[in-house]
From Swiss-Prot:
Family: Belongs to the SLX4 family.
Protein name: Structure-specific endonuclease subunit slx4
Chain's role: Regulatory subunit of the slx1-slx4 structure-specific endonuclease that resolves DNA secondary structures generated during DNA repair and recombination. Has endonuclease activity towards branched DNA substrates, introducing single-strand cuts in duplex DNA close to junctions with ss-DNA.
Pfam families: Slx4
Compositionally biased intervals (Acidic residues): 310-319
Residue ranges with Polar residues bias: 612-623
Annotated stretches, region: Disordered: 86-134, 146-273, 299-323, 367-389, 420-458, 612-657, 717-813
């Protein structure tokens, strides 16, 4: 029967394959997962041996012993593989076992001994025979039970009895000692009457009998089952489970005494627990393996640096490895085999000893790594000597750039660099923490050498004032800085800045963008609502003058008499200069730019005769007969002269054509002669032609004897010349100017009368520049004869009273005359008068009562609120009683108000925009 049992256990090769997989199951059972109790890993941490190269399964204690003593343990290895199949059979029996089966107790024999009886199962091994084969099988089954205790400590196992040598009893006792986590059943009283310890009643086990006095007992195999659910005695189970790895039998054999003491000595660490199976098997062989295993437990800590086998499968092993620090690893190398201290003491001693050891190693590494740095520093010195092509950016920032040589870094008193010995050329230091004295002694020598190369020195921290001065002396050119800096011309940048500043300097008086379109008023044409358009503004240069046309200032240039021959022979009542004398433009205004100065020349006798013949030419009526339907057909003769001339500058006739009588194609051709673009508006074309004609003929008239600084006298004589030329061109047409022109050409006695008549034409000239009325209606002879309103004499009260135009009041003419009169003799008086006027304006604005309406503040409140001041409105407010209240009886022009605002830095603007219309918003 025993032979049959052996055949059943050793059979079924497929179960051997399954047993290899189940020897270390990857996951615990379902009941363990539900109860929340982790399966303990007996092989983990530092006690785990590395995986052999040719291993196919997980290594165990038997495989390690087999490698150390393969000859003596070969039989045990064969028996080990044979028992594995029996263990698998027992695992299968656990699943089919009934829950209440292990509660049955074994019956007592007649001799007083207790027989171990387990519940009969279908596949378990029954009573064994007492022959040699049965004893061998019992040993194998006992070893299988021990394997179950190692791998699955929570599952119950059957206990075996040994009838032959008593070895099975010792093995069973070791099994009890190695199963701390399993619940056990109550044990009966042995043959001597001693009580055994009561185990956990959760899983009952068969009662044991102590093998003493040679009594043989045959153990029964117990049916293994899965752990049940928690019973009512859960508290007692938990209390018994807390004591792990410390439960031993009260009565142990003499051979196991030393094993129990060893386990108690090392219970603090379960990784160093001895293996009782290996000790029992190897003890009889006499190879000294037990002592080797003891030495192995003491020598285990240095192997903690190796990766364990079950590192990924067991999270507890990972936590135990990660908890060890670097100091612990270093301290393990300083372990002495003669020390008997615990692991904690060895780690602590390793930390204290390892700190000094690591410092020495770091010092050695630093000394060795500093050796190749010295030639590296020499190479950087050679690179610093090389001169590079400096760019503009480098030149500008050289004053602030610090030297980037490695020597400067070594010489700098940085605390961190003082601990590096590569600063010393010799590199000899005692302990690595002392500062070498030689770099400091050599630092001034290196600085002297760098000063010879010409590199920039370290800048000194300057005060704000000196720093601003240094910045102002630097020359920066913004743009592309890829060009190399040229050092041959250091003054090039300064000259460039001076030229740019000179080009940006513009005279505010000549800037057309400073003043509004009513700038003609300040030039002698009164406060005119002139039709300045885009073309007339675009055709002017930076000074506001027409381009490609020689112009003079209309306001500040004295107007000469048109009739140069006759006027040169008559004496002047006001000014009688010599024949070669005239007023220079520079004497009138010294601030005028040289571009607007008129070249002065003297008219010779040949030119006078030519001009006289042109005025008395008989071919003019033929040219003007085509346009006899016009009001002034004689003016077409002047146009014919203009057509004959190649350029407008060659026209010497002082009479301006009547552009109002021209047709649109004729106006277009006239504009093309002045090299202007085509203009669609007829009114704008006429205004542009009038301005061009006046600017064209002024230089020829400015060199005659009639250069009187009084503008009104010059304008009177100019209108007189227009009347004379009209009567000479066409004598057949009855005109009131005909007789007067003959008197002017025949005798000089009628000069006072001509002056009196020219008073009227002076006002006509103002209307030509100020009003929107066509020139044909303004220059009609009926208006000049029928005007009966008296006109106040501005400068010459000796002349007879002439009628004033109906569209101009006395106050307006007085303001125009005050704005137009400028004399170099009265410049200082004008400045003093202007300063006095500014004082009165300031007093009038500040003394005015504040406004009660928040939406209509006073002028002073507007200035304080930084509101833009409308010059025309402020001038009208000052002239309506504000100035008279502060003691100023005269009126003020908007231009003077503008100058006062600019002197006080007040934001001001004109009511009229650049297009000639009123501003819609401010």
């Amino acid at each position: 029967m025993a032979t049959t049992d052996v055949f059943i256990i050793s059979s079924s090769p497929p179960r051997r394959l399954v047993s290899h997989i189940a020897s270390s199951p990857p996951l615990p059972s379902l009941d363990k997962m539900v109860n929340g109790k982790k399966a303990s890993n007996l092989r983990q941490g530092s006690s785990v041996a590395p995986i052999p190269t040719g291993a196919t399964i997980f290594a165990s204690a038997s495989t390690l012993l087999r490698e150390s003593s393969s000859g003596s343990l070969q039989g045990f290895d064969n028996a080990r593989s044979f028992v594995t199949s029996a263990v698998q059979d027992e695992n299968d029996l656990k699943k089919s076992a009934k829950p209440k089966a292990p509660r049955k107790t074994a019956p007592k024999k007649e001799d007083g001994t207790v027989e171990k009886v387990a519940k009969a199962s279908r596949k378990t091994v029954k009573k064994k025979d007492k022959d040699v084969s049965g004893d061998f099988v019992d040993e194998l089954v006992g070893e299988a039970a021990e394997i179950i205790a190692e791998k699955k400590p929570r599952k119950p196992r059957a206990k075996k009895g040994d009838n032959a040598e008593g070895k099975s009893g010792s093995v069973a006792e070791a099994t009890v000692e190695k199963k701390p986590r399993k619940s056990r059943a109550k044990k009966a009283v042995d043959a001597t009457g001693e009580d055994l310890k009561e185990k956990v009643p959760r899983k009952s086990r068969a009662k044991k009998t102590d093998v003493e006095a040679g009594i043989e007992t045959v153990p029964k195999e117990k049916a293994v089952r899965k752990p049940r659910a928690k019973n009512s005695d859960l508290d007692s189970n938990l209390q018994s489970k807390m004591v792990k790895g410390r439960v031993t039998k009260s009565a142990v054999n003499a051979s196991n005494t030393h094993k129990v003491e060893t386990s108690k000595a090392d219970t603090g660490n379960k990784h160093f627990a001895p293996n009782p199976i290996v000790e029992d098997i190897v003890a009889d062989e006499g190879f000294g393996l037990v002592e080797a295993i003891r030495r192995r437990t003491n020598w285990t800590p240095p192997k903690s640096t190796k990766v364990p086998i079950d590192l990924e499968d067991s999270p507890e092993a990972q936590e135990s490895d990660t908890s060890k620090g670097f100091a612990e690893l270093l301290g393990s190398f300083g372990y002495s085999s003669y020390q008997a201290d615990s692991i904690e003491k060895r780690i602590s001693s390793g930390v204290s000893n390892g700190a000094a050891a690591t410092r020495k190693r770091k010092l050695i590494e630093m000394v060795t790594t500093n050796i190749p740095r010295e030639p590296g520093s020499k190479t950087t010195k050679e690179k610093a000597v090389k001169k590079k092509a400096r760019t503009l950016t480098d030149l500008a920032t050289s004053a602030y750039a610090t030297a980037e040589d490695d020597d400067n870094l070594l010489d700098a008193p940085t605390p961190l660099l003082q601990y590096f010995p590569h600063a010393a050329p010799e590199g000899s230091t005692n302990n690595g923490f002392k500062i070498p004295p030689k770099p400091r002694s050599k630092s001034p020598m290196k600085r002297v050498q760098k000063s010879k190369t010409g590199s920039a020195e370290e800048p000194i921290l300057l005060s704000p004032e000196s720093a601003m001065k240094q910045v102002s002396n630097q020359d920066f050119v913004f743009g592309t800085s890829s060009q190399l800096a040229r050092e041959d011309s250091p003054s090039l940048l300064r000259d460039l800045h001076d030229a740019m500043q000179a080009s940006n300097e513009l005279d505010d008086y000549d800037d057309p963008f400073v003043s509004p379109p009513t700038k003609i008023a300040e030039r002698g044409k009164a406060v005119v609502a002139a039709k300045r358009n885009l073309w007339s503004i675009a055709a002017r240069d930076n000074h506001g003058d027409l381009m490609d046309v020689e112009t003079i200032d209309l306001a500040h240039t004295p107007v000469a008499k048109p009739d140069r021959i006759m006027l040169s022979q008559k004496p002047s009542s006001l000014v009688t200069p010599g024949k070669d004398d005239w007023f220079d433009i520079d004497e009138i205004e010294d601030n005028r730019p040289p571009s607007t100065q008129v070249p002065l020349r003297e008219t010779g006798p040949i030119e006078r005769s030519i001009n006289f013949q042109l005025l008395d030419s008989p071919t003019q009526p033929k040219n003007t007969s085509k346009d006899s339907s016009k009001v002034f057909p004689q003016k077409k003769g002047t146009k014919s002269l203009v057509d004959k001339s190649t350029t407008p500058k060659k026209v010497d006739a002082s009479k301006m054509p009547d552009y109002e009588s021209f047709t649109t194609p004729q106006l277009t051709r006239e504009i093309q002669k002045y090299k202007f673009k085509q203009i669609k508006s007829r009114k704008r074309m006429i205004d542009l032609l009038i301005q061009c004609y006046e600017s064209q003929n002024r230089p020829a008239l400015g060199v005659l004897q009639g250069n009187i600084p009084i503008i009104t006298q010059n304008s009177l004589e100019k209108s007189k010349d227009v009347a004379d030329s009209s009567t000479q061109v066409k004598p057949t047409i009855p005109s009131p100017r005909r007789g007067r022109a003959k008197k002017v050409t025949t005798s000089t006695a009628s000069l006072p009368k001509s002056k009196a008549k020219s008073k009227m034409t002076d006002t006509v000239a103002f209307l030509e520049m100020d009003s929107d009325t066509p020139l044909s209606k303004i220059r009609t002879p009926q208006k000049s004869r029928k005007g009966k309103q008296p006109l106040e004499d501005i400068f010459d009260s000796d002349h007879p009273i002439t009628p004033s135009p109906p569209r101009r009041s006395d106050s307006q003419i007085r303001k125009i005359s005050k704005a137009l009169e400028l004399s170099p003799d009265n410049n200082q008086d004008d400045e003093a008068q202007q300063a006095q006027l500014f004082t009165h304006i300031y007093t009038a604005i500040t003394k005015a009562p504040p406004s009660q309406d928040p939406f209509n503040p006073s002028w002073h409140e507007k200035i304080l609120l930084y509101d833009p001041i409308i010059l025309e409105d402020l001038a009208s407010w000052l002239n309506t009683g504000a100035l008279s209240k502060v003691g100023w009886d005269e009126e003020v022009a908007p231009l003077e108000v503008k100058k006062w605002c600019e002197s006080k830095s007040i934001c001001c603007l004109w009511k009229e925009n650049q297009g000639g219309g009123a501003r819609s918003r401010y």
